[in-house]
């Protein structure tokens, strides 16, 4: 997501990393080929420029965030022309009796086990062979989660992309086509040499990936959810290529808009595991509720969910334009929100380097994000929205 303030971490180990690399064959980017290797990015509303891929990474190293909107040019899309979906969210929590026993089933051990394997791939860079392998492994875990649950109508599908690594979408049908989306991004990147250096991506965003996977597992244990009795459909998304400019999530929500899908809410979980920055600053452990470029009504409801289902409070924070995949939902007119591990300035400084490892994470903190995710998914599954 963002880039750490120091640049030396990945370089120091580069000689060792280069000596023991698995074969990483880059996969072609057909969209960029049309424009002779250049990409159209948007750094702020209306602020666009054509850049090379290396210029993209340079901007990210400088902490600049952006949409890669090259595909919009190819498809003649104009997302800002889309009408915003108007949704009225509940004024309080109505499913605590059902959610509390489910929340007790959330497992730190499951998240640790999944993340241990997920971070063992050399990189989950979206153009790499190991990025495809990690996506394949993730999809198999989701399939196992569904097959071991009572939810016979739940399903998981690939959402293919031209760059290789696919996004993954799991669907739990309800009584209507109104849909609540829970998202995280599965790719990782080492911002120094993306195609070569290791990118374990434990926090960014392996933590969000396994957090929502665990919430998904427990949600399917609900008899009402498993039998399809929820008012609304719930989807869990694991996006490819967030690090390339929100590419995977843009492709998903662009397709959803073309198909007239009725998305009522989208929550992004990107970086859920690092609490040390907050504690080192002498502040209370908390989750960070993003307040800029999000839907105000959904964000207000999420505050209630945190207060009702988490054991720690929230703090309000900002992350800027196009800072994670919720921005893609907003771009196509869908209400979205984002909850991160802390105040933005206290989030992990290890990301986008080989030092973003599982040892830096706090699984008790991730459990709080899982409780919030489960609570939101269940409450909105049965809400009149």
Swiss-Prot record:
Q: Which GO terms describe its molecular function?
A: aminopeptidase activity; metal ion binding; metalloexopeptidase activity
A single GO BP annotation from the record? proteolysis
Tell me the cofactors it needs.
Answer: Zn(2+)
Q: Name one GO cellular component term.
A: extracellular region
What intrachain disulfides are recorded?
A: 319-323
Q: Which residues bind Zn(2+) 1?
A: 185, 204, 270
**TM region positions:** none
Q: Which residues form the propeptide?
A: 20-87
Compartments where located: Secreted
* Glycosylation site list: 177, 229
Enzyme Commission number: 3.4.11.-
State where Zn(2+) 2 binds.
Answer: 204, 243, 352
Co-factor note (free text): Binds 2 Zn(2+) ions per subunit.
Give start-end of the signal peptide.
1-19
Q: Which UniProt keywords apply?
A: Aminopeptidase, Disulfide bond, Glycoprotein, Hydrolase, Metal-binding, Protease, Secreted, Signal, Zinc, Zymogen
Task: Enumerate the InterPro entries for this protein.
Answer: M28_fam (IPR045175), Peptidase_M28 (IPR007484)
**Highest taxon listed in the record's lineage:** Eukaryota
Q: How does it assemble?
A: Monomer.
Q: What does this protein do?
A: Extracellular aminopeptidase that allows assimilation of proteinaceous substrates.
Q: Which PANTHER family match?
A: AMINOPEPTIDASE YDR415C-RELATED, METALLOPEPTIDASE M28 FAMILY MEMBER
By sequence similarity, the record places it as follows:
Belongs to the peptidase M28 family. M28E subfamily.
Q: What is this protein called?
A: Leucine aminopeptidase 1
**Classification lineage:** Eukaryota, Fungi, Dikarya, Ascomycota, Pezizomycotina
């Amino acid at each position: 997501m963002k880039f750490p303030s120091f640049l030396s971490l990945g370089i120091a180990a580069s000689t060792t990393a280069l000596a023991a690399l698995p074969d990483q064959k880059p996969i072609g980017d057909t969209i960029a080929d049309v424009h002779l290797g250049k990409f159209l990015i948007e750094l702020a509303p209306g602020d666009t420029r054509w850049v090379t891929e290396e210029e993209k990474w340079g901007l990210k190293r400088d902490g600049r965030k952006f949409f890669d909107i090259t595909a919009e040019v190819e498809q003649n899309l104009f997302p800002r022309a889309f009408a915003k979906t108007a949704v009225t969210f509940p004024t309080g929590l109505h499913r605590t009796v059902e959610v509390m026993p489910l929340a007790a089933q959330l497992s730190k051990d499951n998240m640790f086990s999944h993340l241990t394997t997920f971070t063992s791939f050399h990189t989950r860079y979206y153009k790499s062979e190991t990025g495809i392998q990690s996506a394949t492994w993730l999809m198999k875990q989701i399939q196992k989660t569904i097959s071991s649950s009572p939810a016979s109508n739940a399903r998981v599908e690939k959402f293919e992309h031209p760059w290789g690594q696919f996004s993954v979408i799991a669907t739990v049908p309800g009584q209507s086509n109104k849909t609540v989306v829970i998202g995280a991004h599965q790719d990782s990147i080492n911002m120094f040499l993306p195609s070569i250096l290791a990118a374990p991506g434990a926090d960014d965003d392996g933590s969000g990936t396994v957090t929502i996977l665990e919430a998904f597992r427990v949600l399917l244990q609900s008899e009402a959810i498993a039998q399809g009795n929820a008012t609304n459909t719930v989807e869990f998304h694991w996006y490819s290529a967030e690090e390339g400019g929100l590419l995977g999530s843009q492709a998903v929500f662009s397709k959803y808009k073309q198909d007239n899908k009725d998305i009522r809410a989208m929550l992004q979980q990107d970086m859920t595991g690092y609490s040390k920055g907050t504690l080192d600053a002498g502040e209370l452990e908390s989750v960070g509720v993003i307040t800029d470029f999000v839907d105000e009504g959904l964000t207000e409801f999420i505050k209630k969910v945190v207060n009702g289902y988490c054991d720690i409070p929230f703090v309000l924070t900002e992350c800027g334009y196009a800072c994670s995949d919720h921005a893609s939902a907003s771009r196509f007119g869908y209400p979205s929100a984002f909850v991160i591990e802390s105040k933005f300035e206290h989030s992990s400084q290890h990301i986008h380097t080989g030092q973003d490892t599982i040892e830096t994470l706090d699984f008790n903190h991730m459990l709080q994000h899982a409780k919030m995710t489960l609570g939101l998914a269940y409450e909105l599954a049965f809400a009149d929205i």
